[in-house]
Structure formats: C-alpha cells, structure tokens
C-alpha cells in the first residue's frame, strides 16, 4: 500500500465514521474544522485502528491537529 493509498483510506474511514459532508483534505483540522467532540474523535480513532490493524497510542495523538498530521502518524506506525 502506497502512502497515497493510506491517505485516501484514512479520509474514507473518517468520512464514513463521522458522516461528515465536508470535503476533507490534509489541512482539515479535526476539532476546529470538523467540529468533532472528544467522543466522536475516540470513535473515529477506533475505526482507523480497526481499518489498519494498528494501535494509536494516546500520547501520540495528543499533538495531532490535522488530517495530514494524523496520516503521518498512521504511516509512521505502519512502518513500525
């Protein structure tokens, strides 16, 4: 799976998980632009963990603001 494939899958999972109608880009801010509550973010992260078969450490997610930063984190975790 290429980096571009991973990024597309992340956006697909987020769109499905949050049922957002926004056009998501790497610059979309998860809280500010999408208006997600902390509970919605937890559900979204669970869906991403399931989709990629990974665990996203809470300590790592604290500094993530945008979908692009989330993509970078997931790609980093996938590379091990």
Give, region by region, the residue ranges found by the protein language model:
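Phosphopantetheine-dependent thiolation modules in NRPS/PKS and related acyl-activating systems
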Residues: 2-36, 40, 44, 50-80
